[in-house]
Amino acid sequence: MVDTIFALTNPGDKIIMFSPYFENYRAQAIMADCEPVFVPLVPPEFNFDANVLEDAFKQGAKAILICNPSNPSGKVFTYDELKLISELCIKYDAFAIMDEVYEHIVYDGHKHIYMNSLPGMWERTVSCSSLSKTYSVTGWRLGYALAPQNIMDRIKQYHDFNTVGAPSPLMEAAVVDLDMPDSYYQEFGAHYAHMKKLFTDGLKQIGIPFTDPQGAYFVLADIGPYMRKGESDVDFCLEMAEKVGVACVPGTSFFNENVNNIVRVHFAKKDETLYEALDRLS
């Protein structure tokens, strides 16, 4: 991702990001001396206002960065939403930087659509993905990008100086991963659907308000009813870890807006771990 930002932008350029956002994005933009321009996603569906988005493009944005499915909201962008974004990219001559690491974790009623498959978008889209989630090898830190040759040439230049390269044994193993049959992805998706149902059903029974994720493996829960007056989400999360034994991430890590009542919890765990977490939360 950071190599792509360096490859596509110049110092002072603006990059549009939806909020809530994966916290690394802001830091990566700042590293490239770029200015983030945030467009809010409105819960519970995390939709966006098309006029607000176009106003962001009108500021002369060089690119828009989208996590689809989204970390942390679990939003899966619809075809109509992506089509609108693509039309704005073309109209204002901007790139689309797509973080698609959760592309195979999408739940019933939703479908992951690749931005570079839309008319006029192949030449202005960089699709970034990772082996971490799809093949459960998060510790390997292996990722890849797909883009037109002229853009890839620049990305590779930055990647060479930033990273040099991944360990060759891991790259050989990655080839095996990428050659998995379709049945693997079907079983993989079904497994995550099972974990999601187990965890969200438990939250419903306990009565903790949350937004139902459309993809990825996160839940944004509303801690407002449980907070003391003047308590921050950071303090709440620290107390949760120390006294309840359940770790969550404060929402202020992800929102550009003044949000203090949301935490992110992830459910990519064994069944017994999820049951234990739900028991501690009840």
Predicted regions and their residues:
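PLP-dependent class I/II
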Residues: 1-282
